Amino acid sequence: MSYGIVTEQIATFDTELRLESGRILGPIDIAYETYGTLNESRSNAILVTHAWTGSAHLAGRYSEDEKRAGWWDEIVGPGALLDTDRYFVICSNVIGSCFGSTGPTSINPKTGKRYNLAFPVITVRDMVKAQALLMDRLGIGKLFCVLGGSMGGMQALEWATQFPERVGSAVVLATTPRPSAQAISLNAVARWAIFNDPNWKKGEYRKNPKDGLALARGIGHITFLSDESMTAKFDRRFSARDGQFDFFGQFEVERYLTYNGYNFVDRFDANSFLYLAKALDLYDVASGCESLEEAFAPVTAPIQFFAFTSDWLYPPAQTEEMVASLKTLGKQVEYHLITSAYGHDAFLLEHQTFTPLVESFLDRVKV
């Protein structure tokens, strides 16, 4: 059952945000949605941070006839993991994206035209600094919890390390302290796909470079799955529409990737895809520090980590490295390795595997 009807809101900030690169971005719009009610002491707010191609549309529908609910609808609502009878849940779109927050599709106030590649390179840390502005606007001094998976988990880590006084707890799923060379190389190939689409025009396109973006999405989508899940869903079955010996005949998995890729281009912008891919590749929770221990030294909040056995994009060993560093420092840390065949996307597809563990963790949080 869906959460119900929701409304997206836009917060505009006339301030200028100094980015990690040293460049200035402003004014800034941040798209966000809220669920539940902020209590009188303003102490029950949970910020959910989205992954690479996510949005602020966490749960519910914008109208009765909308076919798809928000991207994590199942965990939000009365009696759900993020119980809206108990918590005030917030989800905001990151800067650099194309779902309402300031990004390369936004109008550059200096030129009156779209930023496109004039938009500055942004980092996950910059995303979180922008979110802090939103929390200030909402009058929330300290969050009960920050919860996110993948790039959302990176944001949760940044909250815990950069704003420790503002975080009561963090739940981090399927993430990494820093993407590996393999993860970066896969994003590099996805970038090439867009760069080599003649319709990209060095970012100055009027129509989305669909072929390049669809291919880039296909590459990315493979990294979100696992061999086990792909075998279970497709195996080596040949498409019933094609002759096996037709030169352009496709396996079912090929048709799936084609459909998924071209469906994606109708809802996402190519330049935003590139900017967020760059932010992922640049991510390092220990940026500016000599070690993970130095990076995690400011942490005061308890952190609950989840890794998934078949996640080969951000494998469990990368989460375990962070857990070990936090334990060395004597921090409050909890770790669960979830057996799953669904790869990196397990945190989105199998929330029931970790829901009771997160509920128990949140019950023990003191803010």
Curated annotation (Swiss-Prot):
| Residues the record marks as active site | 150, 311, 344
Indicate the segments forming the AB hydrolase-1 domain, all copies: 44-350
Coiled-coil residue spans: none
Keywords carried by this UniProt record? Acyltransferase, Amino-acid biosynthesis, Cytoplasm, Methionine biosynthesis, Transferase
Give the E.C. number(s): 2.3.1.31
Which GO BP annotation is one of this protein's?
A: methionine biosynthetic process
As one GO molecular function, the record gives:
homoserine O-acetyltransferase activity
EC class: transferase
Q: In which pathway does it act?
A: Amino-acid biosynthesis; L-methionine biosynthesis via de novo pathway; O-acetyl-L-homoserine from L-homoserine: step 1/1
Tell me if Transferase is a UniProt keyword of this record: yes
Entry binding sites for substrate? 217, 345
Tell me one Pfam family matched here.
Answer: Abhydrolase_1
Gene Ontology CC annotation, any one: cytoplasm
Q: Which InterPro entries match?
A: AB_hydrolase_1, AB_hydrolase_fold, HAT_MetX-like
SUPFAM superfamilies found in the cross-reference section: alpha/beta-Hydrolases
Catalytic activity annotation: L-homoserine + acetyl-CoA = O-acetyl-L-homoserine + CoA
Which Cys-Cys disulfides exist here?
none
Q: Where in the cell is it found?
A: Cytoplasm
The domain of life is Bacteria
* Family under the similarity heading: Belongs to the AB hydrolase superfamily. MetX family.
* Subunit relationships: Homodimer.
What job does this protein perform?
Answer: Transfers an acetyl group from acetyl-CoA to L-homoserine, forming acetyl-L-homoserine.
User: Under what name is this protein listed?
Assistant: Homoserine O-acetyltransferase
Native source organism of the sequence: Citrifermentans bemidjiense (strain ATCC BAA-1014 / DSM 16622 / JCM 12645 / Bem)
